[in-house]
Amino acid sequence: HSYAAVMVKVNLSDINVPELIADIWSPLNDEQREFLANHFTLQNYKKNEVIHCEGETPTHLMCLLSGKVKIYKDGVGGRSQIIRMIKPVEYFGYRPYFAKTDYVTAASAFEPSLVCQIPMTALMTLLTQNNDLAMFFIKQLSVDLGIADERTVNLTQKHIRGRLAESLLFLKESYGLEEDGSTLSIYLSREDLANLSNMTTSNAIRTLSQFATERLITIDGRKIKIIDEEKLKKISKIG
């Protein structure tokens, strides 16, 4: 079954897609795997390249294999709100298809990213044949809804300090730390950090400086080192 180990040449390095998308590959039988292997495509996105726009009709399930993706919505006065950040290996772009609506958000590559795309029609074929696969997506949607609920509360009820502390912890959770064990593995502009925390850029800059003065973090350009995680958790908690 050579198709079971679909190897794809990307940038001269072999990428074992089935291994990366094990969550949806494992539940499938050989026939279903062959079907999926014949239907997925790989797409490279450059930094800041748009993957889908607000108002578009969803056609594909996206799976981020490498890189980082931001899901955002352009708000009032040209201010954009980052709804969530996608890390490998995570699935996105399929919720509106199930809801029979267009995209209410946009997605763009935060850095060079590799995305595996599966037509929703092909996914629907597999879902009707495979209960375990269907359960996986029910679970995914449930987890995402839980995270969204929590974020709604955080962004609406917490004060500025609490929101920014929350965002820094959220980025650590999502992307981890560099080898030094304290620098966030994602370098956000002040504007992106503000958009993630639902505040103005000037408030984000001011609050970051406060955190640095209080020795909770150190800042070097876009690099943020977390010095006192416990204190950040406390600030995030009391809001």
Language-model features and meaning:
Residues 6-47, 91-92, 96-98:
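Cyclic nucleotide-binding regulatory module and flanking cytosolic helices
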Residues 24, 49-111:
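Cyclic nucleotide-binding regulatory domains
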Residues 32, 84-146:
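Cyclic-nucleotide recognition modules
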Residues 34-35, 51-55, 178:
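Short loop/turn motifs at secondary-structure junctions and domain boundaries
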Residues 61, 85, 109, 117, ...:
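Short aromatic/basic micro-patch
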Residues 128-198:
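Polybasic "coupling" helices that flank or enter modular domains
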Residues 173-239:
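Phosphate-/nucleic-acid-contacting segments
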